């Protein structure tokens, strides 16, 4: 089956909320920088960020800037806009994030045909402007 170009979801339809654990991620994203929560005590990365490290119980956090690259771990091809049901090809992905061992990020991939997306595909972060001046990390083929 041929789906055609994979697109990012329309940014005007996406809104986020932050909390003390996620706000550093979203503030970095607003500046088009990819980061992940790293334990300041043991170095364990975790996404989504949590108040306490699941490995050692520490509350210390670091937010290193990551290279913005990764590898597709999993994906699905969708052909309907989830908000209004209109025809719209998009590809949600789970990406293993480079520079943060064990960290995976849910996003979308765009800039290629949906049928060309595959597990193991190298990707680079691409930013989608969304509501309230925030930016959403998505990916495109590297």
Task: Label each region the model flagged.
Residues 72-111, 119:
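Glycine-rich active-site loops that engage anionic ligands at enzyme catalytic sites
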Residues 1-34, 100, 142:
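A broadly conserved sequence feature marking short terminus-proximal activation segments
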Residues 105-142:
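Well-ordered alpha/beta subsegment
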Residues 33-36, 50:
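Residues immediately within or flanking Cys/His clusters that coordinate Zn2+
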Residues 38-41, 52-58:
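Short, cysteine/histidine-rich loop/knuckle motifs that typically chelate Zn2+
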Residues 62-71, 117-121:
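Short coil-to-beta-strand transition motifs
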Residues 47, 60-62:
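Short functional micro-motifs and their immediate structural scaffolds
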Residues 48-55, 122:
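Short coil-to-beta transition motif at edge beta-strands of beta-rich domains
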């Amino acid at each position: 089956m041929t789906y055609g170009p994979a697109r990012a979801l329309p940014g005007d339809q996406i809104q986020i909320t932050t909390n003390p654990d996620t706000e550093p991620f979203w503030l970095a994203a607003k500046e088009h920088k990819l980061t992940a929560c790293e334990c300041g005590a043991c170095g364990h990365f975790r996404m989504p960020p949590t108040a306490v490290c699941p490995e050692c119980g520490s509350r210390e956090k670091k937010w290193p800037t990551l290279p913005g690259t990764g590898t597709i771990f999993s994906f699905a091809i969708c052909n309907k806009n989830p908000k209004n049901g209109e025809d719209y090809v998009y590809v949600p992905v789970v990406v293993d994030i480079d520079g943060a061992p064990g960290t995976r990020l849910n996003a979308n991939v765009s800039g290629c045909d949906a049928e060309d997306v595959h597990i193991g595909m190298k990707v680079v972060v691409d930013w989608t402007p969304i509501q309230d001046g925030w930016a959403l990390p998505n990916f495109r083929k590297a």
